[in-house]
Each structure stands twice: as C-alpha cells, then as structure tokens.
Amino acid sequence: LLQLLMGFTRLDNAPQLGMVAIIGMSVCDVAFNLVAVCALGLGLWGMGAATALAYCVAVAICCTHFASKRNTLRLVNPLPHLGKLSSVLKIGLPDSLTRVTVMLRTFTFNWLLLVVASGAAVAALSMLSSVNSFASSVTIGVGQTATLLCGIFFGEEDRAALKATLRTGLRMGLMLSCALCAAVFVFAPQVVGLFGLDGEAAAFGVVAVRAFMLCVPIDLINQLFVSYYQSTGNVRAASAIAVGQSGLFAVLFALCTVWTWGAVGVWMSFLVGEAITLALQVVVACVLWKRRRAKAGSVDVAGTLATGLPAPAGPVRASLLDKMMYLPETFQVDWLADQAFSCKPNIESVVECSRNVAAWCQAQGIDGRRAYLIPLAVEEMASNAVEYGFAKTKHPAIDVKLILKRDGTLMLRMRDNGAPFNPMDLDLSAADPYSAVGIRMLRQGVRGVEYQNTVGLNNVVVTLSVSA
C-alpha cells in the first residue's frame, strides 16, 4: 500500500511526500522500537509490532496529499480499465519478486543464525532491518525519482536526457549514500545502542551494521537500474536484478560460508550479493552490446545499399552506461536531426533562444511557414513562463528541443519547472487578436499537442507535419 501511495503522489506532483514518508517511517521505526524494547520490554514481538506501526505512519503521511488543494486524483470505477491489469501486473513484477525474495532471505538467515550462532544474532538481524529502512530513504528516493523522469524521456525517445538522468542519479545518490554509510559505520555502536541491544546481541549488531552499510552504495546502483528498466519496459532485466540483489546471491553465499565463518557469513552476504548482481549486470550488458553491434552492422550496410540513406546509429564510442541502457533498435531510428536549446529566465535570453531556433530551422531546410511559426511559438511560451511561471521557483530553467524526422515531421518539445500551465489552454477569446500569434497558429496548424506536468515539470510536445 505504501509503494502504491508513493507512486500516486509522485505522479500528482508531490514527489517530496514519498521521501518525507520514508524518513518519517524510519524515525518512527527507531522511536517505536525503543519504546517497545526499552520501556515496555516486549522483545522481538514488540520490535515487529513497532516496525508495522511505523509503516502505518508512512501510509498516513502519503494520505495527507488527498486532502490537499494540489490533489487531482479522484476515485473512479475500475471495471472499464480491467484490460490494463495485465500490463500493470507485468510492470510491478520486479517489486513483487523483491518482496518474495526478501521474505525467503529473512527466513533462511534467521534459521542459519539460530543454528550457527544464537538468539542474540537473530535479534541483531531484526535490528538490521530497521537500519535498512533508514538507509533505503536514499536508495528508494533516487530510484523512484528516476522512474518518473526516465519514463518521460523514454516516451520522447530522448537518449541524451535518459543518460543524463542516470548519471545525475548515480552521482547524487552515491554522494548521499557514501556520506550516510560513513556516518553510520563510524557510529555503529551508538546506532546499535539506540535499539536497546547489549552484551552479545550488541556485539553482533555492531559487526552486522558495519558490514551491511558497505553494500548500500552498490544497492543504490542496482536499485537505480531496476527503476530505469521498469520505466523503459525492460521487465526481464528489472526482475533479474531484483531477485539477485534482494537475496538470491546473498543466500547462496551465506549457505556456503556460514558453517566456517559463523554469523559473519550472514553479515557479509549482503555486500557479496549486491556486488555479484552488479558485476553480472556489467558482464551481460557488454556481451549483449557486442552481439547487438555486430548484428546491427550487417543490417545497416544492407539498408544503406538498398535505400541510399545513411543508417541511424547509436553512440559510436559507447560508454558502459550506454551499454547498460538496453535501448530498443527502433529508438530514434526515424530522427534525421535534432538540437537542444536552453535559455535563462529572462526576456533577453528568450529572444536569443528564438533566434537560435530560427537559425536551426533555416539550416535544416524547414519550409517557410514552420520556420516562422516555431521560433515565434517558442518565444511566446518561454516569455509566458518567465513573466508568470517562476514566481515561486528557486532555480528556474527552460529547455527547448527540436526534432526533424525523416518523413519531414517537425517536433517541438518545451520543458520548464515553473507553475503548472498548459499554453494550449490559454484563453485567447477576449485577448488582443494580434497577441500570442504563435500560439494561435499552433492551435490551428498542428498535428498533435501533448501536455503533462510531472515531478514539477511542464512538458509540452507539439508535432507539425509537412503540410502544416
């Protein structure tokens, strides 16, 4: 239920609420465990009840969105939408596999610790689940944010934006996770003490926490790619990673080492499981990329000979990230040319951006009507964002992208982080008939207009055919 609600709030422009819910759950989990163990003396049963109650707090935090003025979600009759159930279940398969694998891993680890160690080690493992909940505030937050953005960029077939999103997620996520790991690793005795563990259980707990924190940065990478593959429809890859990182390799490693290493084999299994999962991702991606490029090379030669047109290709010198993206062969295959423009949130920069757009259209041989219409529309929509959309935006930004397809279709994509506003909904009935000429002409001559506001971004996609 919590994951479902977090998905709804992210889609409804409240992505920060999910992070607040995770942090609130983690804090409450620690506090409730302290009360259950130290004040009430409820032991393991109390720790389990405290964790369940912490999840209820997170659900309650997410539910506050439905009472806010920004909420646009409404209950509907689900019966007409039953046909979409299979695709929903397919997309959610990795999450389901994660839950099942974690359950089996927990059962196996509890049994192993009881056999080779003691009940104190089991108590340390239970405490470790609470620490994991706290650490997941970073890994889940980065992964879920990437899911939304990658879904948008994949639908737009924007390879550069997809790659930039993954790079940013990796860079920022690793910085946060490494800082968190360093702090918890150093203060592991104090962290364990918060849960009321002492004696043998505390000794097990310190080793467990320090060993576990080493795997969090790798877990972030794996989680980020699970989210990316889910958003791009690669359920097979997402499911494989989910099973691997959630427990398959960890359980196998623990079963092989616990008889000689004791409880340390269990604690180290988290790191080993995540590392093996990541290593296998890299190996498989490199092998499949090599096979794919070899196959694509022969096909491209045949296509060029048959049509006389140069075959579109992906990056010539592919990075490891390119190889791990697994973009379909049809991705951007119909693109002839594209160009991205950025403008600062001021009128002078907007005018300059419009001129650059006009110059690009002229360089690409765009017909006169569209070469006049597109720069004018860009200037009007960007000016509207500058004048009215950024009053409450700390770091305003406007991005423009033009795509010329092989059939002559021209696509305009504009994105800004201002207040939600669809320029196609602008009421021009009472306005000056000579104002917003570009937007007026767009309404009359476009083949299609799409608008959505997701994670605080206005996204407008305008498609103009050759005859527009």
Please provide the spans of the model-predicted regions.
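Flexible, glycine-/charge-rich segments associated with ATP-binding catalytic modules
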Residues: 300-341, 444-468
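Conserved short strand/loop->alpha-helix "switch" segment adjacent to the catalytic nucleotide/phosphoryl-transfer site
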Residues: 357-379
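Small-residue-rich hydrophobic transmembrane alpha-helices
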Residues: 2-18, 122-182, 186, 220-233, ...
